[in-house]
């Protein structure tokens, strides 16, 4: 039996119309791109896109811009101004998780945390309840690059991840100097491995970097201004109290309370080992150029060091620069026998005063 050409066309059309719709997973694999203009739409549709553009999103008060559990390989781009409604709560304002995720910012974008609405000079120590800014928790084998951030209410990036790189992150909280910004840490790292933070440009009122636990962490090429300097710790009294194999290098700390510091907690246990500070330039430091102490309690030094968190294999080399006349150039206060095998070379600080209160300084170090 012969089939006419018209009949063949009809059969072909029927076959096409009967073809099932591509499943969501196929859309991701084929490179679908989605642009979202609301936080609600982004949360609902994030699983259907391989590229997500967040376009001028205004996140409602008390809600998180939720980019957790993204499909592997997803790219996320912040475009325009991302802003957040005001409410007293703990946050976070933004949250990401997933594997092989790549987060970046389009030209001219800004993520505005709205800090002045919360700032009251008290940070997380009282007053208004303030949201943390950005959780990179379980964001593994991923990158965050080229983000421009302004006015975080309190802490900026909370990092709990493995093999995460953050490059060219700018955080400008300089308005907080006059408007009550406090506890505006830029990067807090805990229980993480193989973290690299490169080329950061930070203006804030607390630590530029604080590593509380983790291993194989690098901070390189950073500029830190206005805060408390670059810190290890405080280490102790957490679930994880081990800091190991950290390199902080080729960075600048200016107009800050401290240059570089290592802090461990009074009567706590843990360990700090294999930490290197190298080629750090300091300028106009107000309190301490280099400070290492084992006496912290409730966020403040006690003057009574303990030895439960030993600091070993510490290298401080080529830390140079200027301090205010009221600042102390170097302060070291260790517990009995808990600081050992340090390398100290090429450090040169001027303008400040010598400390008369150092204790248990290990061989090779200078105080």
Swiss-Prot record:
What InterPro entries does this protein's entry cite?
Glyco_hydro_28, Glycosyl_hydrlase_28, PbH1, Pectin_lyas_fold, Pectin_lyase_fold/virulence
Sorted alphabetically, the Gene Ontology cellular component annotations on this record are: extracellular region
Q: Name one GO biological process term.
A: pectin catabolic process
Q: What class of enzyme is it?
A: hydrolase
Reactions performed catalytically? (1,4-alpha-D-galacturonosyl)n+m + H2O = (1,4-alpha-D-galacturonosyl)n + (1,4-alpha-D-galacturonosyl)m
Q: Which pairs of Cys residues are joined through disulfide bonds in the record?
A: 34-49, 208-224, 334-339, 358-367
- Per the UniProt record, which residue ranges are transmembrane? none
Instruction: Name the keywords, alphabetized.
Output: Cell wall biogenesis/degradation, Disulfide bond, Glycoprotein, Glycosidase, Hydrolase, Repeat, Secreted, Signal
Q: Where are the PbH1 repeats?
A: 161-191, 192-213, 214-234, 243-264, 272-294
Output this protein's name: Polygalacturonase
Q: Which taxonomic lineage is given here? A: Eukaryota, Fungi, Dikarya, Ascomycota, Pezizomycotina
